[in-house]
Amino acid sequence: MMIKVLLLLSSALVLFTPEAEGGCGCHTECSLQCSFSGCGYVCGLRCRCSWGK
């Protein structure tokens, strides 16, 4: 079970790569909950991801 979680986490981090490339960034702690819509990620109810700084 733990291995599956780690695999999901690592693939999510790859998908939501860095703001340095000019894309949308996502906080690590909510990247698994992000759904992509245009350039706004909505992460669960508490986190919101936006353009990288």
From Swiss-Prot:
Residues 1-22 form the signal peptide. Disulfide bonds: none annotated. It comes from the Eukaryota. Contains 4 disulfide bonds. It is found in: Secreted; Nematocyst. Its main location: secreted. Keywords: Amidation, Disulfide bond, Nematocyst, Neurotoxin, Secreted, Signal, Toxin. One of its GO terms (molecular function) is toxin activity. The modification Tryptophan amide is found at W51. The keyword DNA damage does not apply. One of its GO terms (cellular component) is nematocyst. In vivo, only causes a weak change in behavior in shrimps (C.multidentata) (slight twitching of the walking legs), but no lethal effect is observed. No activity is observed when injected into fly larvae (M.domestica). This is Toxin CjTL7. It comes from Epiactis japonica.
